[in-house]
């Protein structure tokens, strides 16, 4: 689960789950402020936006629900540093 700095949390990725839900791109920044995650997780091998570019999961991981819905390994990798 990831939270943004507004402490909005969710357990997956999705195109529409950005700043308002704490997933996706917003999570990259939110992890450092409200959820106890490391700031760097947003762009490394952590959660949200960073997953699409830095974790080897593939671009779609940061935006498509299919990443988290159908690729559990990718899902865990995206969010493994967000607890």
Swiss-Prot record:
Keyword Repeat: yes
Subunit structure: Interacts with hair keratins.
Xref: Pfam families: KRTAP
Disulfide cysteine pairs (residue numbers): none
Domain of life: Eukaryota
Keyword annotations from UniProtKB, A to Z: Keratin, Repeat
Function: In the hair cortex, hair keratin intermediate filaments are embedded in an interfilamentous matrix, consisting of hair keratin-associated proteins (KRTAP), which are essential for the formation of a rigid and resistant hair shaft through their extensive disulfide bond cross-linking with abundant cysteine residues of hair keratins. The matrix proteins include the high-sulfur and high-glycine-tyrosine keratins.
UniProt-listed InterPro entries: KRTAP_type8/19/20/21/22
Any one annotated GO CC term: intermediate filament
Source organism of the structure: Homo sapiens (Human)
Protein name: Keratin-associated protein 21-2
